[in-house]
Amino acid sequence: MKLEPHPNRAGCCGKLRVYSPHEFLACFLARVFKIVFGIIFEGVLMYGMIRNLLFKLPPEQAHNLSLKGLDMVHRLGVLKHLVPAVPAHPVTVMGLEFPNPVGLAAGLDKNAVHMNALGDLGFGFIEVGTVTPLAQPGNPEPRMFRLPEHQAIINRMGFNNQGLGHLLAQVDRRKFRGVLGINVGKNKNTPDQDSAQDYRKCITAVYNRADYITVNVSSPNTPGLRDLQFGDSLKQLLAAVKDEQLSCQKDHSRYVPIAVKIAPDMDDAGIRFVATALVESGLDGVIATNTTISREAVAGHRHCNEAGGLSGAPVREPSLRIIRGLHAELGDRLPIIGVGGITDGASAAEKIQAGAKLVQIYTGFIYRGPGLIGEAAAAIKALG
């Protein structure tokens, strides 16, 4: 059956065309969803209401429920009709073409289970993980805490994930065809002196499935991990990562760029050291930054003494300081991906002005909803 829209009116998705039964049903359901839920993802009213309901649940439970709901709407075929359009603003970074510079940071979709639904929201790229060679449960619950007064979250998840095998199976059957980054880390029980082997295993496994790879040495929730950011430990790890990258390039006849994700908790000397080490390593980018262990911005909050990394609005300035410092050292020799404290268009644009080529969001996405993607992309595009 084919249904022809009235010749003087646009079709249910705003186009004059003939619809197949499946397309008509998808558009019809989209209209129903918009009417019933009130432009659910534009965030003006309904997202705030839904968020307030979800925030009555424990954070990790709300997180999982939200992603399952997103998957359900995606499977109905209506999700992409519900979200506001994200302005096109193509950029080329690390040799990859991004439809817009606003990506999803690692941590939201650790096991690459929700890529297809998340891909409907308009992200310029999606980063999944952190994945480790072996599955691990992470730290005991509760391990995530909201600080809504600060638009912030404290987490001590501890690289909980189902391991490389599970993630690869998800990636192999994905329908999402946008730019995919895979964030890799070390298992908690791997001795520090063997850390490089975990990263090598991950890089080898994901190399031919990823558009880019991120080496995570900056989570505060794996004991000893942040020590890999400094001194000979960093230089030796970067050398091992580069060696594995070149070996994989030879095996697959394809070059996959690798970025390194760093913490915001380093002084100017640390920034200079990291910048020099990255350039000397021959790797391809740096992601600045991960969560902070500082509690200065949230002092006095009932959760401020919880162990873990603080993300969200309080990381805005620390992240900017690192980006500016890196850019001063690196210039255009190595691209920077800015992440941390992006809660609106202005905070996304200032990351670009500070020297980043791309940005990523996570905690701001939880507090603001999918409308933040388009707002951030529009603000960056307006910079010219």
Identify the role of each PLM range.
Residues 129-178:
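A gly/proline- and charged-residue-enriched helix-loop-helix capping module
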